[in-house]
Amino acid sequence: LFESYCASILATSALGVAAFTGTGLLPEGFTAGDMQLRAMFLPVVLAGVGILLSVAGVFMVRTEEDASQKSLLKALARGVDLACIGVAIVSLGLVYWMLPNFLGVCVSIITGLAAGWLIGKWTEYCTSDEFAPTRKLADQSLTGPGTIVTAGIADGMRSVWAPVVVVVVAMILAFGFAAKWNLNDVTWFAMGLYGVGIAAVGM
């Protein structure tokens, strides 16, 4: 996880530099070097803020001594939700400060954030004993190890469709928002790729 997160930060920084190599996207009063530095440091700053807010979210988790699995999941969800809301708010301020003419990048960040949140909820549904898939799988053990192994493999294969759909939709939306939906303009293509990268950092 750490390696993939660092890779997404570095890749997004590189895409940010590439997006402002020409003069087509430069706002008035900014040089290419200014915008490249801002686009390069945005994912780094966003990741740092996200880590701090995640730590703060951990301290928001409160449970009772003999809490059930359901109440534990709710407490964890509360911490995650608060951290996500915090990142969304801070990202708006960061993008407004660092890339003021490209607020679509903020929407790309929120898109990635929402995609990560949805995938987390789906994972919880597929793996928690509070929900139907795991309970049905437990019932398979009554007939022996063969059926539970087969059912487990089938459930695992079946569970990946939602994350795939969410990631594909998030990529399309992140690209479009960052590129301001100028899909036929080559100048904005690199900015769209930057949006996909920054969405991965937000995720």
Question: Can you describe what each PLM-predicted range is?
Answer:
Residues 1-203:
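Hydrophobic packing and interface segments
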